[in-house]
Amino acid sequence: MAHKKGASSSRNGRDSNAKRLGVKRFAGQVVSAGEILVRQRGTRFHPGTNVRRGDDDTLFACASGRVRFGRSGKRRAVSVDT
C-alpha cells in the first residue's frame, strides 16, 4: 500500500450519524407500558421495578405509571411507580 497520499485524496471526511441516545422520559412523567425511558450504550442506568432492558440496553416501561430515578445500591436505577 502507498504510504503517500495520491493526488487530491484525503484521509478525513467520515463521520457517523448521531444515535439519539439519552433519557427520553424524566422523573415524574406519566408513561404507559412499552414507552422507551432511556436509550443507552451499556448499562449507565439499570432497570428497576416495572422496567425491562432491551437487547441494545434500552430501558422501557412494563406498566403504566410515573417515572422515578433512584439508586439500587451503587447503581442508578429507573423505576415506574404504578
Curated annotation (Swiss-Prot):
Keywords: Ribonucleoprotein, Ribosomal protein. Signal peptide: none annotated. Pfam families: Ribosomal_L27. NCBIfam families: L27. The keyword DNA-binding does not apply. The gene is rpmA. InterPro entries: Ribosomal_bL27 (IPR001684), Ribosomal_bL27_CS (IPR018261). Belongs to the bacterial ribosomal protein bL27 family. GO terms for molecular function: structural constituent of ribosome. Gene3D superfamilies: 2.40.50.100. It comes from Tropheryma whipplei (strain TW08/27). One of its GO terms (biological process) is translation. Residues 1-21 are annotated as: Disordered. This is Large ribosomal subunit protein bL27. The lineage of its organism: Bacteria, Bacillati, Actinomycetota, Actinomycetes, Micrococcales. One of its GO terms (cellular component) is cytosolic large ribosomal subunit.
